Design a protein with these regions (language model features):
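Active-site metal-binding motif and surrounding structural segment of the metallo-beta-lactamase
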Residues: 32-78
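Active-site neighborhood of phospho(di)ester-bond hydrolases with catalytic His/Asp-centered motifs
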Residues: 26-29, 50-57, 77-80, 139-142, ...
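Cap/insert and terminal regions of metallo-dependent hydrolase folds
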Residues: 149-246
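Conserved beta-strand hairpin/beta-sheet module of binuclear metal-dependent hydrolase folds
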Residues: 1-42, 127-143, 160
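Structured catalytic core of nucleotide-sugar glycosyltransferases
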Residues: 4-14, 56-65, 87
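Metal-dependent catalytic neighborhoods of phosphoester/phosphodiester hydrolases
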Residues: 63-72, 87-89, 222-229
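Active-site environment of divalent metal-dependent phosphoester hydrolases
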Residues: 58-62, 84-85, 123-124, 146-149, ...
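Metallo-beta-lactamase
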Residues: 80-128, 132-135
């Protein structure tokens, strides 16, 4: 199994998870031309995508999914709450294969097993995912205000983690956001700060961990160096070992 990011941040998110002939997009918050270009940068063609999994309905995660899926005749997996909230995206006159999932029930998409889990975020029924090829697991957590025991039980023992490090608390406090937006981002249904991500990581069994990527970094309230330092301190490793998913280019393929 291998995985890459096409983009990560408030302007658009999309990951690719691949095993065998199965290639899944996790979220699709990119326009069609941008998505096609970024897939080419990872050596892929749009026709090679098996399907799309959505974490929640926010624009930066979902806005490009439905036209892409309709054009390429591929299914979309999403929670019931997300399904209810995405009506505004659905293209008129085009049929879509929307597959509603139970956020506590694993399911199989060809060569990849997908284990969903609910998270606290300000969306209708937000869900994050752990992916497995039968030998290795990739845990993804990109939009949550806080950790929970269930989140940690899902992510413990993974071979790879993509972990939200959205903001530095001091930078958010002193940054340009309005008081209301600061409260939202830093709240229990907002986004995970560097310190909270580090504490979550410290609660996991990381003995099998081969890759860790800090994701969904705020351009105004964080820096890659701060996110790397927070996670590296937990793992007792050099900062350079902590990967960064950025807005411009995501991150290149990582293999398990």
């Amino acid at each position: 199994m291998r995985f890459a990011s096409l983009a990560s941040g408030s302007a658009g998110n999309c990951m690719v998870i691949e095993h065998g002939s199965t290639r899944l997009l996790l979220d699709c918050g990119l326009g069609p031309r941008d998505l096609a270009s970024r897939l080419i940068s990872r050596g892929l063609d749009s026709q090679q995508i098996t399907g799309i999994i959505l974490t929640h309905e926010h624009d930066d995660h979902a806005k490009g999914a439905f036209k892409f899926a309709a054009f390429h005749n591929i299914p979309i997996w999403l929670s019931h709450g997300t399904r209810v909230m995405v009506e505004r995206y659905l293209p008129e006159g085009l049929s879509l294969d929307l597959r509603v999932i139970d956020s506590h029930q694993p399911f199989q998409i060809q060569d990849i097993e997908v284990a969903p889990y609910p998270v606290p975020h300000d969306a209708r029924e937000p869900t994050q995912f752990v992916f497995s090829d039968g030998q290795h697991t990739l845990g993804v957590l990109t939009d949550t205000g806080v950790s929970t025991p269930h989140i940690e039980s899902m992510l413990t023992g993974c071979d790879a983690l993509v972990l939200e490090c959205n903001h530095d608390l001091e930078m958010l406090k002193n940054g340009p956001y309005s008081p209301a937006l600061k409260k939202r981002v830093g709240g229990r249904l907002g986004h995970l700060d560097n310190g909270s991500a580090a504490r979550l990581l410290a609660n996991l069994d990381n003995r099998k961990l081969k890759h860790i990527i800090a994701a969904h970094l705020s351009a105004k309230n964080n820096t890659p160096e701060l996110a790397q330092a927070a996670l590296a301190a937990v793992l007792n490793c050099g900062r350079e070992w902590i990967g960064i998913a950025n807005q411009v280019s995501g991150f290149d393929w990582r293999s398990l």
